[in-house]
Swiss-Prot record:
GO terms for biological process: defense response. Its main location: secreted. Expressed by the venom gland. It comes from Hadronyche formidabilis. It is found in: Secreted. Disulfide bonds join C4-C18, C11-C22, C17-C36. This is Omega-hexatoxin-Hf1a.
Length: 37
């Protein structure tokens, strides 16, 4: 079975995250990426 993605790691969907929450964050380069909360 798939393991959940930890906080701070890139994610496609909320369901992939251990926290069940994947939101857009701005990284150090100013790019917007979805990461687990």
């Amino acid at each position: 079975s798939p393991t959940c993605i930890r906080s701070g790691q890139p994610c496609p969907y909320n369901e992939n995250c251990c926290s069940q929450s994947c939101t857009f964050k701005t990284n150090e380069n100013g790019n917007t990426v979805k990461r687990c909360d």
